[in-house]
């Protein structure tokens, strides 16, 4: 599974932030595949493919994730920056709602405690994103 969230990196748990930073570059591997791109933000099948015409947004998102991880004191393996030219995107309310629901679901179903800046967060930590 590859996570690409719409929530600002600053509100993600440490675990979700690092997972997205690590997994987001996987989308670039799909660029040579000719299957159709979904018209709307989706989770599951088509999630990564949705971002192919939006690679500029992905590059900027990855830079934001990197900056947030560094601000939290994470030691990262250096990676070349992703390109920031190309298609842009602004998540609409529907995309934010879908993503918030998934974040809430993952946090509530977590087997181990999750953290924000090293502090354990309650299962309701992401509930404000649903409003």
Each model region followed by its residue ranges:
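Extended, charge-rich alpha-helical interface modules
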Residues: 1-131
């Amino acid at each position: 599974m590859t996570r690409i969230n719409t929530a600002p990196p600053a509100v993600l748990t440490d675990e979700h932030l690092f997972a997205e930073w690590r997994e987001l570059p996987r989308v670039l591997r799909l660029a040579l595949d000719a299957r159709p791109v979904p018209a709307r933000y989706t989770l599951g099948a088509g999630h990564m493919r949705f971002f192919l015409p939006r690679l500029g947004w992905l590059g900027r998102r990855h830079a934001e994730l990197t900056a947030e991880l560094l601000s939290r004191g994470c030691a990262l393996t250096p990676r070349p920056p992703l390109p920031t030219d190309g298609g842009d995107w602004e998540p609409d309310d529907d995309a934010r709602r879908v993503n918030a629901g998934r974040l809430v679901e993952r946090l509530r179903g977590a087997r181990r405690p999750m953290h924000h800046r090293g502090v354990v967060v309650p299962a309701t930590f992401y509930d404000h994103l649903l409003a």
